[in-house]
């Protein structure tokens, strides 16, 4: 069934170019998806290149297993654990580049059975890995009203969060919601002011999905691990699709592109300064999709690619 869903990889060439591929390098594609980035990376390798791909979606793993290439291997798990995967293979400090394409993919959105979309009726699931953790329906049925409101406000930036949370709890008390259409209808009815250009359930679905999959924590942990696993000169190439993701990536790159912040006038020896270490990253800028790509793939509109390089510090 999954092969019926077309996936157009956003900023494909730009993200891979950002890795500055070495033919004999070792790289990580932390979000294999349907393999667009991985296949392009493999095409730029020599015989000694090595690509470790990661994904927690079983459907992505099934696609990855069709790649018959000794330079390629796939891991079923969250990219937040990339530090562990690298350590298990004795590759700490040897990784030449890490690519992350954040958020939900088109095949996940377009498959009603995955429960990510308010546009298609399906089970209210939303898990990247349906074999682990609580589904969206299970969480919404057990969560406190205040907790639901907090999630909607924090992860969806939903201004009617309290009103929507109350409606969700009341509906679940009457009859537990199990379908995406049911949640979308409850949210729409609880939203007093409609946005002309956006479905009223957009922010709620985003927020619940992020919460169910711990998406922002996953990003923060992966970024933190990247500093340990990257070789000097190794690249980070990260595509984000909304402001919450991009804010985390931007802040991480900015903070690690500065040296230690020492108060002016604080007496320190050269040896003490050396122990503090220098900046760990060099930010190489950001890219956004051009008009042509957005016209071909409207979902690319909000994407931002940020690139950074590991220093020798």
UniProtKB/Swiss-Prot annotation:
Q: Which InterPro entries match?
A: RsmH (IPR002903), SAM-dep_MeTrfase_MraW_recog (IPR023397), SAM-dependent_MTases_sf (IPR029063)
- Gene coding for it: rsmH
- UniProt catalytic activity: cytidine(1402) in 16S rRNA + S-adenosyl-L-methionine = N(4)-methylcytidine(1402) in 16S rRNA + S-adenosyl-L-homocysteine + H(+)
Recorded superkingdom: Bacteria
The name on file for this protein is Ribosomal RNA small subunit methyltransferase H
Give a short account of what the protein does: Specifically methylates the N4 position of cytidine in position 1402 (C1402) of 16S rRNA.
The protein's UniProt keywords, in alphabetical order, are:
Cytoplasm, Methyltransferase, rRNA processing, S-adenosyl-L-methionine, Transferase
Tell me the Gene Ontology biological-process terms attached to this UniProt entry.
rRNA base methylation
Please classify the protein's predominant subcellular localization into one broad category: cytoplasm
Please give the GO cellular component terms listed in this UniProt entry. Answer: cytoplasm
| Organism per entry | Escherichia coli O7:K1 (strain IAI39 / ExPEC)
Family annotation (HAMAP family): 16SrRNA_methyltr_H
């Amino acid at each position: 069934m999954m092969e019926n869903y077309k996936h157009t990889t956003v900023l494909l060439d730009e993200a891979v170019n950002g890795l500055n591929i070495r033919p004999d390098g070792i790289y990580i594609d932390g979000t294999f998806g349907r393999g667009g980035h991985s296949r392009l990376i493999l095409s730029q390798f020599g015989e000694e290149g090595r690509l470790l791909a990661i994904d927690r979606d079983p459907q992505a793993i099934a696609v990855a297993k069709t790649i018959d290439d000794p330079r390629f291997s796939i891991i079923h798990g969250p990219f937040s654990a990339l530090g562990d995967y690298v350590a298990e293979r004795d590759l700490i400090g040897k990784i030449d580049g890490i690519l992350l394409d954040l958020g939900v993919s088109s095949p996940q959105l377009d498959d009603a059975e995955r429960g990510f979309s308010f546009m298609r009726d399906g089970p209210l699931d939303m898990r990247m890995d349906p074999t682990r953790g609580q589904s969206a329906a299970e969480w919404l049925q057990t969560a406190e009203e205040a907790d639901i409101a907090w999630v909607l406000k924090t992860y969806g930036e939903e201004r009617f969060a309290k009103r929507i949370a109350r409606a969700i709890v009341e509906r679940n008390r009457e009859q537990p919601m199990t379908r995406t259409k049911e949640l979308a209808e409850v949210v729409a009815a609880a939203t007093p002011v409609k946005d002309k250009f956006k479905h009223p359930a957009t922010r709620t679905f985003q927020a619940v999905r992020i919460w169910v999959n711990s998406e922002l924590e996953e990003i923060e942990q992966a970024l933190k691990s990247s500093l340990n696993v990257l070789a000097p000169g190794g690249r980070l190439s990260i595509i984000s699709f909304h402001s919450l993701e991009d804010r985390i990536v931007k802040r991480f790159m900015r903070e690690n592109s500065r040296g230690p912040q020492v108060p002016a006038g604080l007496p320190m020896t050269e040896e003490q300064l050396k122990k503090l270490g220098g900046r760990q990253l060099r930010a190489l800028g950001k890219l956004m999709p051009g008009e042509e790509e957005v016209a071909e793939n409207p979902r690319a509109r909000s994407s931002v690619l940020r690139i950074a390089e590991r220093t020798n510090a």
